[in-house]
Design a protein with these regions (language model features):
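Flexible, polar/low-complexity N-terminal or interdomain linker segments that lie immediately upstream
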Residues: 1-40, 112-140, 146, 270-274
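Hydrophobic anchor at the start of a short beta-strand
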Residues: 27, 68, 93-94, 152-154
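Short loop/helix-cap segments at secondary-structure boundaries that form the rim of catalytic
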Residues: 39-46, 60-62, 164-168
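Short acidic-hydrophobic, aromatic-tinged amphipathic segments that line or gate anion-handling sites
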Residues: 50-52
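Catalytic cysteine-centered active loop of the rhodanese-like fold, especially the PTP/DSP P-loop
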Residues: 56-103
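A polyampholytic, Gly/Pro-enriched intrinsically disordered region
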Residues: 69-79, 112-121, 126, 178
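Long, charge-dense
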Residues: 99-111, 116
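Extended, well-folded catalytic/binding cores that form a central cleft or groove in large enzyme
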Residues: 120-132, 136-146, 150-274
Length: 276
C-alpha cells in the first residue's frame, strides 16, 4: 500500500486524501471520532473503518505495516495522538488536516452509516447475490470494497435462494428480485447504491456509472465503453467458474475503469481551464 504524501508535521490535506479514495492502494481512513461526535453526524469518509481513538493502544497492531489516515472531529489531539501510537506500532500513519469537519465543509462525499447493512463483530458487512456474476454483481462489490467496507464479505448462491440466505445469515441481498438494492427504471443496482450512499456527485464515479449502466441494461449507446465492458465481463465469466475468484479478477477491471474515469475527468477540467 503506497503511503500518502504528508507534510513535515505528519498531517495530510483533505485534497490529498480525496484523490486517493477509491484507488486499490488508498491508505486506510480511520474514523477515530468520539461516540458523541459520530452520533451527531453518523456519516463517514468513504472507505473508512471506525475505531475509538482514545483506545488506540488496544487496536494499533491491526494496522502494522499498513498506510493509514486518521481523522477525528477537527484533526487535533485525538487523531494526532492516535496517529503517533500507530506509528509506534509500525503503521504509516498521518492525521487528516482539519479532520471530519473540514472534509464536510468542503462538500466532499460522506456515506451515511444508516444506509449500510449491519456489521458483524469484526466490523464487516455481509452481502448475498445470484451466482455467476457478469456486470452489476461485480461492479457493486467493487464499489462496496473501495468506498464502503474494504473487508466486506460476498456470498454467491442460487437465484432462488438469495432472499432466504439473506434472512438466515443476516446478509444484505442485492441485484436480485425482491431486494432493496436492485434495478429501478432504467437504472441498475450500481446506480441505486451510488445515490443512496452520496457518491453520485463525484464526476469520475458518474462517468463510470454510465458505462456500467449501459453494459448491464443492454444500452451500449449511452457510453462508448459499455460494449467493451460486456465483452470483458462475459469473457471473465467463461474463463473462471469460481465466483469468488471471478470477483477478485473483476476488481482489477473496475480499478482500471475508475482510474480511466478519474484521468478523463482531470483532462476535461484541464481543457476547460485552457479554453477559459
Amino acid at each position: 500500500m503506497t503511503p500518502i504524501q504528508a507534510s513535515s508535521d505528519q498531517l495530510v490535506s483533505i485534497d490529498a486524501l480525496r484523490r486517493r479514495i477509491g484507488a486499490p492502494d488508498c491508505p486506510v481512513p480511520i474514523d477515530a471520532r468520539t461516540a458523541e461526535d459520530f452520533a451527531a453526524d453518523p456519516r463517514f469518509i468513504p472507505g473508512s473503518v471506525r475505531r475509538p481513538g482514545l483506545d488506540v493502544r488496544a487496536w494499533a497492531s491491526e494496522f502494522t505495516g499498513k498506510s493509514t489516515v486518521v481523522y477525528c472531529q477537527r484533526g487535533l489531539k485525538i487523531s494526532q495522538g492516535a496517529a503517533a501510537y500507530l506509528r509506534l506500532a509500525g503503521a504509516q500513519a498521518v492525521a487528516l488536516e482539519g479532520g471530519f469537519e473540514s472534509w464536510r465543509e468542503a462538500g466532499l462525499a460522506l456515506v451515511p452509516e444508516a444506509a449500510i447493512g449491519s456489521r458483524d463483530d469484526q466490523g464487516r458487512t455481509h452481502w448475498v447475490t445470484r451466482a455467476r456474476p457478469k456486470v452489476d454483481r461485480i461492479a457493486c462489490p467493487w464499489l462496496i470494497r473501495r468506498f464502503i467496507d474494504r473487508d466486506a464479505v460476498f456470498l454467491f448462491v442460487q437465484a432462488s435462494e438469495v432472499l432466504a440466505v439473506a434472512e438466515r445469515f443476516g446478509a444484505t441481498p442485492f441485484d436480485t428480485e425482491g431486494a432493496v438494492w436492485n434495478h429501478a427504471g432504467e437504472n441498475c443496482t450500481f446506480d441505486a447504491m451510488l445515490e443512496a450512499w452520496g457518491l453520485d456527485a463525484d464526476p469520475a464515479i458518474a462517468r463510470l456509472a454510465r458505462v456500467v449502466r449501459g453494459a448491464d441494461t443492454g444500452r451500449p449507446d449511452i457510453a462508448a465503453e459499455a460494449a467493451g465492458l460486456v465483452a470483458l465481463s462475459r469473457g471473465l465469466s467463461a474463463l473462471i467458474d469460481d465466483d469468488l475468484r471471478q470477483l477478485e479478477q473483476g476488481m482489477v477491471i473496475y480499478d482500471a475503469l475508475y482510474a480511466w474515469a478519474c484521468n478523463a475527468e482531470a483532462l476535461s477540467a484541464a481543457n476547460l481551464g485552457a479554453a477559459a
